[in-house]
Amino acid sequence: MLKLSRVFLPVILFASCLGAYGQQITKEELLFLTPEWKGERFPDGRPKVSDAILDRMKLVTLEEAWAVLRNENYKHQYDEGWMTINPDSVLVGRAVTATFVPGRPDIHRVIDEKGHSKEKRVKSQNSWTIDMLVKRDVYVVDQFGAHEDGPTIGDNLGNSIYTKTGNGVVYDGALRDINGLRDIKSFTSFFRSYHPSHHLNNPDGALNTTLVGINKPTRIGKATVMPGDVVLGRDGGVMFIPPHLAEKVVKTSEIVRLRDMFGHQRLREQKYTPGQIDSRWSPEIEKDFSAWLNEHINDLPVPKEQIQELLKSRTW
């Protein structure tokens, strides 16, 4: 009996993964998995970090975000080693996740049947998650690093993704039609490789990819990603920020940014030594920093109301 349970347990777990609505997560599951998010949500339960926070996130560096997450014990939210489209741009948005596995005919058939007949999905599985995208989403795909015969995204779907979201993708696999994708304005994307082939999705013939998860927890390289995470892609790396920590990441980054600007200016003026700026600031330097904030409040790359909030919290 024990041996049988070991055999059937993975099957039972996989069946439960498909859930009552096929491979798409239910609202109840998503609420259960994101209890620390207290803000607005999409109708399906996905956390909806505000547009204002997303706007401010564009100036956050990977180092700043990494430090905040590390201090909160989130140690597996970053991955690197990407090829990029628009490498000098920053990708920010709310994650919508898709998980593919190497194609398996029996699973593929029942997912196709349920998707087409009961969920009214159209065409092949590689477009199903894309049909759900909205503005400021980022399509995050675990394509298990598939290379030859692996690409599920080319310039046709790329145009659809960009039209729906205004963003590019994070794609753990190969893309195709790279020239066409580069022609899409602001399609800032991170992907593993390029190959001119395309995925194969015929369960009665050539098949190499099957979609088993929509908006479920997924793995991208060394990172764990949840739907609704804030995606921050820049400088060759991608950070996946839990929604309940997004505001803290932004505010911490803004404080660091302002202190760096002040410190660099004072060093150029030779008012303080590098040792004074690099160590814990004295009360005199902190007072000077507050005065500098007030003096330049309309010219700094941080919202004025955020600087005012910072000044109110200071005691010097």
PLM regions with names:
Residues 234-235:
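Short acidic-glycine loop/turn motifs at beta-strand connectors
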Residues 1-9:
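Bacterial N-terminal signal peptides that target proteins for export
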